[in-house]
Amino acid sequence: MIETRSDEQKYAFLRTEESREKNRYGDNIELAEEGNALREVSLNINGDTGISENPDRYKQHGFYLNADNCIGCHACEAACSEKNDNPAHISFRSVGYVEGGTYPDYQRLNISMACNHCDDPVCLKGCPTRAYTKFAEYGAVLQDPDICFGCGYCTWVCPYNAPQLDPVKGEVSKCNMCVDRLEVGLKPSCVSACLGNALDFGVIENVPENREQAQAEIPGFPTTDITHPNIRFQQTRQNKREMTRTDSMPLKYHKDEEVGKYKPVVDEKHGVKKQWNWKALLMTHESSHVIFTLSTQAILGAFLIIVLGSFTGVEAIVAIQSSVAYLPLLVLMNVLLMFGFYKLNMHLGKPHRFYRGFYNLRHSPVSREIAGVSLFFSSLLGFSVFSYFEIKPLIGLFAIMGVLSGPVGLFYMYKLYRIKARPFWDHWQTASSFVGTCLSLGSLTIVFVALIADALNTTQYISLVVLLLLGLLLEAIGHVAHAADLKNSEGEGSASWYLQTTRFAWPYIISNVLLGSSIIVSCLLLDSPSSTLGWLILGLSLLSTAVIRRSLFFALVIPTTMPGAFFWKNKAFEEHAKETGLANMPQVGVRYEEHRTFKVGELIDTIKTTTAKEAIDQLKEIFYWKKVK
C-alpha cells in the first residue's frame, strides 16, 4: 500500500465515527456483515496484497459537496487528473455551474461532480463486457478500461456523465474513489486538494463537521430515483427562482414553489429559427447505429415474412420461393445484415474485442441484443445455405431458430434504448418505430428483388403492400403520440422537442412529408400493386424517411446530466473546436475521434495465450452467472 507523508494534514484523513444502518433510500450502509466471504479480501491494488484495518472498510462511502463554499477553482479536477495521469480531454471530476439573476444581483452556483458510486449502478448493469464491479470495500464502483471495448453504453445510461469515453484510446474510464488512498486512511485526492473546504468524503449519511445539511438534491442535479447516488449536498444560500446553464444545453432550472425543488424546463437560448444542419444530423459517431438498426430490422422483417408467409401459404411468398429471385434475395439479406454488423463493430473503440459483448448476459440488454441478433444472423446464414442445397429438415431447423432468436434480438434492441437518463428514447414509440421498420423495410426488400426478377403477378403484390402499409401506419401513430407527449412534458424530453422544431426543424418536417407521402403512395399501390414507377417513388421516399428519422432519433436525445461551463463540458464549444482546428491543441481539452482499426494480431495473440480451461471458465461465468474459482 502507498505510504502516507509524514507531514500529511489532519483534514486529509478519513474520520471514524458511528454510522446509520440504512441510508435515505433504505439500502444497507454495511455492505458485508461479519463472516461474509467478501470481507478480509485484498483489493490487490497495483499487485499489493495488503488489507486495510479501517473499521469502516465495508461501509458505503460517498462524497459531500458544500456548494456554499465551492469557488470554482477546479483544484479538485487538477488533483484528480494528476493522480490518474489523465490527458487534457479526460476528467473524472468536473466543475460546472448554474447562474441566476442579473447584475448586480447575480448568483453563481458551482457544482463539483465525479462518479457517485451509486447503490444501483446502471453502468454496471448496462456494460456488456462486465468491466464494472461494485465492491464491498467502501461501496466503490470500479471500472477496468482494459476489459472495456469502447461501446460507450455506460455513458448513455449514467445520469451524471461519470464514465468518460476516450476518443483516442477507444475505452471508458472513470473515478475510482481513490481506493488506494482509502486503504491507508486518506480521503480521495480531489477532497484533499479542495481550497474552499467544499468537498468532503466519508461514510454516507454521516454529516461532516461544521455542516448543517446532507441533501440529495441541488439545482442542476438529476433525479436520484434512477441510481440512488452516494453524494450529499449542502447549500444554505437562497437561490434565485430560475437558474440557467451557460453550456449549450437548452435547459434551465425553475423552482417549484409548492414542493420547494428545482425542475428542469426548456431554455430557448438558441432562438426559434428553423434550421437544416444536415451534416450534424447525418455525419456523426452514431451513424453506425443508424445503419445497424435499420439493416437489422429490415432483414428481420423480410425473414419473418418469408418464413411465416411460407408456413401459412401466402401466395406471394410461395411464388417468390419457387422463382429465380429467391436465392438472390437471400444473398442480399445476408449481405445487408453483414454490413450492418460490420458498421456496428467498427464503431467500437476496440473492434477486435467484439467477443466481449456477450459477457454480461445476466444484466445488460446490449449483451442480450448482441446474442439475439448474432443467433439470428447464424440462423439466416444456415437457412440460406441449406435453401441452396434444398435440405428441408435443416431449412426448417434454421427457420425455427431465426423466428425465435430474431424477435428476441429486436426486443432487447428496444430495451437497450429505454433509458431513464435519456427521456427522448424512454417512450413506447421506440418499439413502434422498430416494429414498423421491420414491416415496411422488410416488405420493401422482398418487393425490390421481386420487381427486378419479375417474380410476381399483379395481385400477388397486394399482401406485401398491406404489410408495408401497416408498418408505416404503426410508425406514424407512434411519432404522433411521441410528439404530443414531448410537447406536454418537462425537462430533457421537452428540450429534445425544442431541438426537433428548431435546430433540426427542416429535416423533421421533410421526414414527416415523406412519411405521409409513403402512406399515400402505398394506398395507391393497392389499386395498381405492380406499378414499377409507384414502387420506385415509394422506395426512395421510404428509405429517405427511415434514414432521416433514425438519425433524428440519435441526434435529438438529451441526457440527464450535470451542467457544464462556458468552455469545459460544453458540446457547442467542442463542435466549434473541431470545426476551427482548436482541437489540434491538446490544452484545449477537445480531441477528434480517431479511426478505429481491427487489430487482428492482438486477437490472434489472445486466442493463442488463452488456455482451454480459461475459455471454459469464462463461458461458465457468462452462462452460470457466478464466479468460477
Regions found by a protein language model. Name each.
Residues 1-294, 302-311, 316, 335, ...:
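Non-ligating segments of multi-cofactor redox enzymes
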Residues 29, 47, 310, 329-391:
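Long, hydrophobic/aromatic-enriched structural stretches that serve as scaffold segments
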Residues 56-68, 280-301, 318-342, 360-374, ...:
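Membrane-entry segments of alpha-helical transmembrane domains in multi-pass membrane proteins
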Residues 286-287, 291-298, 314-321, 363-364, ...:
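Long, contiguous internal "core" modules enriched in hydrophobic/ aromatic residues
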Residues 348-356, 417-421, 487-488, 554-561:
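Juxtamembrane/interfacial segments flanking transmembrane helices
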Residues 484-504, 557-604:
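Cytosolic/matrix-facing juxtamembrane and C-terminal tails of multi-pass cellular membrane proteins
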Residues 517-524, 579-629:
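Primarily interfacial, aromatic-capped hydrophobic alpha-helices that serve as membrane anchors
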